[in-house]
Amino acid sequence: MAALDQQPLLHDGGDQKPPPEGAARRFRRCRTAPSSEPPPTDKDNSSAADAPPKTLFTGGGRPSFRLVGLLLVAYLLLGTIAFYLAMDHMSGTRTTRALDALYFCVVTMTTVGYGDLVPASDAAKLLACAFVFAGVAVVGTFLSKAADYLVEKQEALLFRALHSHTMVRAMEMNKVRYKLYTAGLLLVAAVASGTVVLWKVEGMRAVDAFYCVCATVTTLGYGDRSFSSEGGRAFAVAWITVSTVVVALFFLYAAELYTERRQRELARWVLRRRTTNMDLEAADLDGDHRVGAADFVLYKLKELGKISQEDISEFLDEFDNLDADHSGTLSPADLAAAQPTPDPPPSLR
């Protein structure tokens, strides 16, 4: 009986050995959590739809730009066909019908808008308006993917800054720096190639060629200089698309490198800063003058800007709603009681 009294109240079924002195302590699953899932119900069929989206932090990998590529191909294909059929209603410098249609489609999508080839009839103007908004949607999709990549990259950077070794962090920083250098070299190559083509093929002066290239890659498109020959427009179809994407990637990687540095500096400052009595008071969420591991982690996450007090309050409200017996813990019975009662079949009503 005495031996039974000395056993722990909560026992996992295996021998638990105390960790050696000085060993790192690991957070384990809360013992009050259910060891198995409750029986499946009809509501479980929608669990896949309720699953959170995959990110870099949760193992989803880098956001795919496949959708952007498909939209780009579809836009260029439909736009070329549409403007090919409407080419009789266009005015400006003309070369060949198909090449001019593709050239005008690319200039419209990238919002360069030289003005050397413009719609002349009402039908052509309405068609151009439709493809202007469609092109902006394609560019917006690319920017949204880039923004998602930056946000998810921040999650991965925070995790690595808190858990990885110094050498691994340096390798990740160098990887971003190399991507920025590569994009910079591609940008220089795009500017140089465009300048040479405008100088040699279009017959512009070197300064005018460089001026037109800068106005093009930044999608400014003043319109006083543009591609007018058949060879120049054939080059411009691929060059304008590639150069504008390279510029966007260059600034994306520059923002990523800057964000990564700021994130690492913030994580390093939080980890190295000494915890004071004021920090303990701020971390004491329940006001019992004791700060547990969960309270401390939440305080550090708030300090890093990864979670706010509003988020914590929402989570606590959800916990209170699920805690049917008000025991302070969750069990399968609490979850079953919190589930709404399904409507009976129409035949039983």
From Swiss-Prot:
Residues annotated to bind Ca(2+) 2: 323, 325, 327, 329, 334
Effect of residue 295 to E: No effect on targeting to protein storage vacuole
Primary location: membrane
GO cellular component terms, semicolon-separated: plant-type vacuole membrane; plasma membrane
Gene Ontology annotations of biological process type: intracellular potassium ion homeostasis; potassium ion transmembrane transport
Membrane disposition: Multi-pass membrane protein
Keyword Ion transport: yes
Described purpose of this protein according to its UniProt entry: Highly selective inward-rectifying potassium channel that is specifically located in the tonoplast of protein storage vacuoles. Functions independently of the voltage difference across the membrane.
Stated family: Belongs to the two pore domain potassium channel (TC 1.A.1.7) family.
Subunit (UniProt): Homodimer.
Protein known as: Two pore potassium channel b
